[in-house]
Design a protein with these regions (language model features):
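Active-site-adjacent loop and "lid" segments of alpha/beta metabolic enzymes
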Residues: 1-8, 37, 45, 142-149
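Phosphate/nucleotide-donor binding subsite
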Residues: 1-23
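Glycine/small-residue-rich loop that forms an oxyanion/phosphate-binding "nest" at active or ligand-binding sites
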Residues: 12, 18-19, 34-50
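Short, charged beta->alpha transition segments
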Residues: 13-17, 51-58, 88-94
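Glycine-rich phosphate-binding loop
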Residues: 15-36, 114, 119-121, 125, ...
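Glycine-rich phosphate/nucleotide-binding loop
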Residues: 40-53, 59-67, 145-150, 154-250
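Glycine-rich beta-alpha junction loops
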Residues: 72-74, 107-112, 139-141, 153-157, ...
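Glycine-rich phosphate/diphosphate-binding loop of Rossmann-like nucleotide-binding domains
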Residues: 74-139, 148
Length: 250
């Protein structure tokens, strides 16, 4: 429907260019739902990938961690969580150079019996299928614990993303209002650490696609361009394809 209604939109034109391999990557600040649907139809999912996911890098005390899913899918099953862990592990190995990234499941408690039936089943599935699964993680530890990958459904993930974004802006504004001039440089450094203007990759597609916020600044687009170029040069799509081909041939 989106493709038929707006065939000449900049988003669709860019996706078609990516499909035809006339460009190496695509970046947009357009509607997220339209992007996911259109890219899945035009670019297609990598064989073996169950669902395309939004996987932003969230800054914290130890650098950053990958959050997935951050808004692409609300309804997930245990196999989807395993699939997400696999996708994010490949992405983490490329972006952070960590070949054995830890995987946590966002939940209301650390016990394996906590959460909804889907989360309980996802815990069991990840425990059996993913060697680097480290169990549940409560939200209060997101900012001060060393984690590499944090899994949740898209509804919860989008709330986490927007809450941390809003909270960071609020705290920085409070510091600006209350601090004296001599602390201005420290505030600028904090802003660089808690940078929520960064872009988000759409993992699972047969092409490199980045999503920026609708109110993104030039810094966000600059980051997206640099990240897209990096992922292309490091052959992210080939590496994901090769991983899932290996699974299918076993």
């Amino acid at each position: 429907k989106v493709i038929k209604q707006k065939p000449n939109s900049s988003m669709l034109i860019a996706l078609k260019l990516l499909k035809e391999k006339k460009v190496n990557a695509m970046i947009t600040c357009g509607n997220t739902g339209a992007l996911i649907l259109s890219s899945t139809v035009l670019i297609k999912k990598i064989s073996g990938v169950k669902k395309v996911i939004l996987a932003p890098k969230i800054p914290n005390k130890y650098g950053s961690f990958i959050l997935a899913d951050a808004g692409a899918n609300i309804n997930l099953n245990p196999l989807n969580f395993i699939n997400m862990a696999e996708l994010c592990s490949i992405y983490s190995s490329i972006t952070n150079g960590n070949n054995n990234p830890s995987v946590h499941l966002l939940n209301i408690g650390h016990e394996e019996s906590k959460g909804t039936p889907i989360l309980v089943d996802a815990y069991q599935a990840l425990s059996k299928k993913h060697p680097n699964f480290k169990g549940n993680l409560e939200p209060r530890y997101l900012m001060d614990k060393k984690i590499d990958i944090l899994l949740c459904d898209g509804f919860v993930g989008n709330i986490v993303l927007k809450l941390t974004e809003g909270l960071s802006h609020y705290l920085l504004n409070i510091l600006k209002e209350k601090s004296e001039n001599r602390f201005i440089e420290d505030i600028k450094n904090l802003k660089n650490i808690f940078n929520y203007e960064l872009s988000t990759i759409l993992l699972g597609l047969n092409g490199i696609v980045f999503k920026c916020h609708g109110s993104s600044s030039y810094k966000s687009f600059t980051h997206a361009i640099n990240e897209a170029e990096k992922m292309y040069n490091l052959r992210l799509i080939n590496r994901i394809n090769n991983f899932f081909k290996g699974i299918e041939t076993k």
